[in-house]
Amino acid sequence: MEGQGVGRTLRLLRNRLPRLRAGQSQNNPGEAVTEPERIQEHSPSSFAGGQHFFEYLLVVSLKKKRLGDDYEPTITYQFPKRENLLRGQQEEEDRLLSAIPLFCFPDGNEWAPLTEYPRETFSFVLTNVDGSRKIGYCRRLLPAGPGPQLPKVYCIISCIGCFGLFSKILDEVEKRHQISMAVIYPFMQGLREAAFPAPGKTVTLKSFIPDSGTEFISLTRPLDSHLEHVDFSVLLHCLHLEQIIQIFASAVLERKIIFLAEGLSTLSQCIHAAAALLYPFSWAHTYIPVVPESLLATVCCPTPFMVGVQMRFLQEVMDSPMEEVLLVNLCEGTFLLSVGDEKDILPPKLQDDILDSLGQGINELKTSEQINEHVSGPFVQFFVKTVGHYASYIKREASGQGHFQERSFCKAVTSKTKRRFVKKFVKTQLFSLFIQEAEKSRNPPAGYFQKKILEYEEQKKQKKSRERL
């Protein structure tokens, strides 16, 4: 029966969500929500599917079912409406639009009108059949008006990973929603016509609001764009540094990781942050920041996954048949389940280096950009020290096609503890996908990771020069 339950879940994923591209993650049949935002060295541009900030603005509302007292999430507003689509495009859009309500209300269908409800900002990721990714940026709140109300969700679907910027856009949408839906339309139309700014640049929109007059809204993209899709502060607030390192170690070996929290915002931000620690590598397995109630059987899957589950479903999760899972309680800052060897996965010296770097001056950080850089840096440095020499072990044919020399690459690591780790890591999909891209490219991508590799190599040269003196 357990296998049948998982099978039903996977079939539902296939039917409700956009299909995966051929050849992706073959050990995850039916997987549809995959891969975090920071997919490649040029992450932000890998999402940019043209000039538009976004593809859709959707309003998802709760509508009572014909039978019973349950409610069903339904799209009640869509901008823009797509017309004259080809048959394949129409089918793809229909799959996308049928999946979105499920992720806007992942906590089930048992609702009642409310007089108070704390607004929530969260996100989800969908992968299309062609490999392009769409992010849903969501703001869930109570509509304006007298008496009890059912919450609704404003959901912006975009190909661009820039969470801080879209959070500000949702603030503007929320401000207008309190007046009228008619006020939202011209703002979103202006946004749709604006060009997405380059790193460090600003786009300014002119918008008219009744009783307030004309407003100018500035949307600025962070100068350092490689971390613009994530915010590490919530993860730091929920967990100790040692726990974050153990989660990283589990993810590096592509294990099953479940995050538990009460709020959707906490869940989605923490799981995005955990996946971002893997940079420049990509989580290539099931990845669902907030698992809808109807898909809870995902936690029984035998293949690797990184998922977020609301605390209200804790008992269902604990009653599910699971093996070798790291179950993280973000509310209490504890591990409810673990494999037991999480502290021993990384080379001890490098693990201590990460911990020391994270702890230095962490209380003096003020802005989210400072926090992001401080947290990400030690993990990037870990990969620089363990596998940063990869480019030297790609032999190229005359055509330019490269072939990775795995055995020589591993032998080049002089430290026994490092080599033991590297031999395991090269067998993961994280590393395999990264190397496949590197084999295709004649030169390493001139991005943040390559910059850190070159800095590290220069430091080693300078150290050797000093030792000779």
UniProtKB/Swiss-Prot annotation:
Gene3D superfamilies given in the database record: 3.30.450.200, 3.40.50.11500
Keywords: Cytoplasm, Guanine-nucleotide releasing factor
One CC-aspect GO term: nucleoplasm
Protein name per the record: DENN domain-containing protein 2D
Species this chain originates from: Mus musculus (Mouse)
Entry superkingdom: Eukaryota
Pfam families: dDENN, DENN, uDENN
Domain dDENN: 361-445
Record-annotated cDENN domain positions: 226-359
Keyword Cytoplasm attached: yes
SMART domains: dDENN (SM00801), DENN (SM00799), uDENN (SM00800)
Gene Ontology MF terms in the entry: guanyl-nucleotide exchange factor activity
Function: Guanine nucleotide exchange factor (GEF) which may activate RAB9A and RAB9B. Promotes the exchange of GDP to GTP, converting inactive GDP-bound Rab proteins into their active GTP-bound form.
Localization (cell): Cytoplasm
InterPro entries reported in the protein's UniProt record: cDENN_dom (IPR001194), dDENN_dom (IPR005112), DENN_C (IPR043153), DENN_domain_containing_2 (IPR051942), Tripartite_DENN (IPR037516), uDENN_dom (IPR005113)
Region named Disordered: 17-44
Annotated uDENN domain residues: 55-204
